[in-house]
Amino acid sequence: MKLKLVAVAVTTLLAAGAVNAAEVYNKDGNKLDLYGKVHAQHYFSDDTGSDGDKTYARLGFKGETQINDQLTGFGQWEYEFKGNRSENQGSDKDKTRLAFAGLKFAEFGSFDYGRNYGVAYDIGAWTDVLPEFGGDTWTQTDVFMTGRTTGVATYRNTDFFGLVEGLNFAAQYQGKNDRDGVQEANGDGFGLSATYEYEGFGVGATYAKSDRTDKQVNAASNFNANGKNAEVWAAGLKYDANDIYLAATYSETLNMTTFGDDHIANKTQNFEAVAQYQFDFGLRPSIAYLKSKGKDIGSWGDQDLVEYIDLGATYYFNKNMSTFVDYKINLLDDTNFTKDARVSTDNVVAVGLNYQF
């Protein structure tokens, strides 16, 4: 019975997005939840950039206030503290992951603004479920609307105005962020996503298009794209029931995806697939395959940017404590391209303990 309760708790935890919040306040229509985790981990690799201590902690809150029977206000903030820095280095590389606020209008959907996930990640998240790695062929932080990003206004509708259970859609606008680092800059853009889930099965698609900044266009080189617009489309399938999780996504990007030493590919074709099983006693093994093919990379032509098999496992002691191992088997060969572009070709093993509340 105890083992079954662990499995139920883990399944609930995963369905909730790996956030097991502690309720701090709930009175008179106002609610505040606090959540966080300590992720103690170490990487082993011949690649010096992917070797060593990678410990960090995260802390966040979710709040909501009931304005009336049809209108609810909400907000969320999340911050990451690096645990592998010396005390003299202080808060170097600490970062705000999420910071947004919005309004929910009953069955008519919600609107929010701030630093949030781009709508393209609605599909990318389906395969970004590995113990440590994964989700890195086309969903990237601060790269347009493919991951966490800034200055996004998002409208979301659940169950299609309350008429079709499981049918969700979103529309998003992102304002210009003209940063010095061209890999993290973006012009004005919009994105759309739609998903439908029924009895464990899910299907979804997304599309986003943005202007590129002048700095991005002018940074064109033998490795960097020179197009004036960045685009992505993606489609995905998943099955999540009976302790089984299966998911696959296919996507194509244009003038968007970063690779190697901060380069931007003209075009990529990306595939990700993952399979997991949740045992009653807390073990969750995982296997995945990911590949990103770069197209028309300057004089280099078509090149593999990412390709690896991932073997991993997580063991949940309970809903708050887990341990994991994740082995990234890199299938890329050492070539003149990978050396010049500084694309890693080494294997990586990650091991760690995770406490979350």
UniProtKB/Swiss-Prot annotation:
Any one Gene Ontology cellular component term annotated for this protein: pore complex
Major location category of this protein: membrane
Cellular localisation: Cell outer membrane
Cross-referenced CDD domains: gram_neg_porins
Name of protein: Outer membrane porin protein OmpD
NCBIfam families attached to this UniProt entry: PRK10554.1
Record gene name: ompD
Sorted UniProt keywords: Cell outer membrane, Ion transport, Membrane, Porin, Signal, Transmembrane, Transmembrane beta strand, Transport
